Amino acid sequence: MRKPIVPFDDIWKNVVNAAQALEPIPDALGDVYLVRNLYGTVRISVSDAVEGDESCLAALQRLARRLHEVLGAHGVLQENGILFVTDAFLKSIQGGKREVRPNVYLVDRLVTASDWWTVGEPPFPGKAARYTLYSVKGGVGRSTTAAVLAWHLARNGKRVLVMDLDLESPGLSSAVLEPDRRPDYGITDWFVEALVGQGEQVIGRMTAAPRWAQDFDGDVRIAPAHGRESGEYLAKLGRVYMDTDVDPWPVRLHRLLMSLENECTPDVVLLESRSGLHDIAAATVTDVAAHVLLFATDSESNWTDYRILFRHWQQHDLAEQIRERLSIVSALTPEFDTERYLQRFQEGAWDLFRDHLYDDVEAPDSADGFSFDLDDDDAPHDPLVIHWTRGLAAGASLHDLKHSTVSLAYASFLDRFDRLARAGSPREQ
């Protein structure tokens, strides 16, 4: 008879139970890493400095034997379950570690999605307020909203930098910039030129201002995905996300962001993120100290996808670090039965935040936790509302934004955004 399957989703639960039931580990052993590799099998990694220590080896063998017993096909034979590695290797895998008992850590080795594992401050913090426009699904109006926000902020005297980081589906520049005003270079050009030390030589030629912003008290600069001519766009795109020997992709993104902020000196930076759960989106959500506008519609598929992301943050103890950076956006709010739709949307958003990012406390100002009432209109789950209108349905309208059209669709959104901006992002507080 075959043994019952141990599915992938049960790996960490079984590993945690095995590690926590283990007798005390000798201090001489140092840190112990339980590493799930790309195939989903788990091995123990420790410093090769303890390889000859019999007491340490005995403790490791007990743990390896127990892991083999509880992991099924995701385990390995006891004799193959212990890896003695260099201290340099141990240091290289520490970024996504979780402690399950003193000096015992879980680590995932991933091809993608590893950037969702941490929430941190950028290595090169800027002076501008940063906002990321993100969604788990496309087609929810992020590009239009980036243009409207830039229009609104510039009319009120702000200097605004808009970066089109939805590189797999570029379109912001063509929707906002007239063909004769597009810059020579774009974001993909910077990434490939920076590989050979020419990044700073294109920075001054990769932003441009839309004609509709020329009479405003402020300023708008658009950094498009590509320049006036797309050139070998796919060949460049294939090199954008690579890690170099010196810097991983998120650090390269920070360098671009800082270079553009130094060049344009904006008050506000708007980052149009790629949609979905890929690492590329993660960098703009978790790593640039931006306030994140989460675009959603009231559909079960949207809430399901957001639950995947929120549950991940909850399980990896990241809720406290990320939750106050988030604000949900009701995108494409329908023209008819709007009140009932928004009530359902708010309840869905509250369920999402309450179940995964809020603490289970009665009062929002409790010293022991963090929570919000359903009807708290400054809470992350309370939506910034964008109304669907025919006037903004066509991308061409972004070349010539009209106050009446914007007011019809975005009046509520912009009022709430201004209140959010006055309160300040977590990085500024």
Task: Please tell me what each predicted stretch does.
Residues L167-N262:
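P-loop/Walker-type NTP enzyme "switch/lid" segment
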Residues H381-Q429:
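C-terminal helical/tail subdomains of lipid-metabolizing enzymes
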Residues D10, S55-L71, A88-L90, N156, ...:
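Conserved catalytic-core segment of NTP-binding enzymes
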Residues A113-P125:
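Pre-Walker A adenine-sensing motif
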Residues G126-S169:
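Walker A/P-loop phosphate-binding motif and the immediately C-terminal alpha-helix
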Residues V148, H152, A175, A283:
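Active-site signature of alpha/beta-hydrolase-fold catalytic machinery across serine-
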Residues N37, E54, Q78-D87, G227, ...:
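Beta-strand-loop-alpha "switch" segments that mediate conformational coupling across diverse proteins
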Residues M1-L110, S114:
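Long, basic/Gly/Ser/Thr-rich N-terminal segments
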